[in-house]
A protein has these predicted regions:
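Polybasic "coupling" helices that flank or enter modular domains
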Residues: 51-52, 67-115
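Cyclic nucleotide-binding regulatory domains
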Residues: 1-51
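A generic structural signal for short hydrophobic patches within well-formed alpha-helices
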Residues: 31, 63-64
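A short local loop/turn or secondary-structure capping micro-motif enriched for an aromatic residue
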Residues: 19-20, 64-66
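Conserved active-site beta-strand element of glycosyltransferases/polysaccharide synthases
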Residues: 56
Length: 115
């Protein structure tokens, strides 16, 4: 598990072998490694650091132990999961219906929110 402090990480999904598309952007509001932390063996996403900086790292076994014992951590994880699903849905709609200029503006605003 990685917890970005002052960097941001793109979540990419593979398309047609070697191509990919960004489906999410994670900054200090979230964590990288959510599927694995939830017990899913492999994440369907590839994480790429887009804006350099620092992040905290936690072993999955330690995260799962804390998750099983902490109501507050569960609440935060569920909230983050919900917000990430909203972001993924918004990204899909934007990629389908917006112009390149609008998509770039959205991406710039999202990166600004995360630094």
């Amino acid at each position: 598990m990685y917890f970005p402090n002052d960097c941001f990480v793109s979540m990419l999904t593979g398309v047609d072998g070697d191509r990919s598309s960004e489906v999410g952007l994670i900054g200090s509001e979230g964590m990288v490694g959510l599927p694995v932390a939830l017990g899913i063996g492999v994440s369907p996403f590839r994480a790429v650091v887009q804006g350099g900086g620092t992040a905290l790292r936690m072993k999955i076994v330690d995260f799962r132990r804390e998750f099983s014992e902490s109501v507050a951590l569960k609440r935060e994880l569920f909230l983050f999961t919900h917000l990430l699903m909203i972001q993924i849905a918004q990204t899909a709609a934007c990629n389908r219906f917006h112009t390149v200029t609008q998509r770039m503006a959205r991406w710039l605003l999202m990166t600004r929110d995360r630094v």
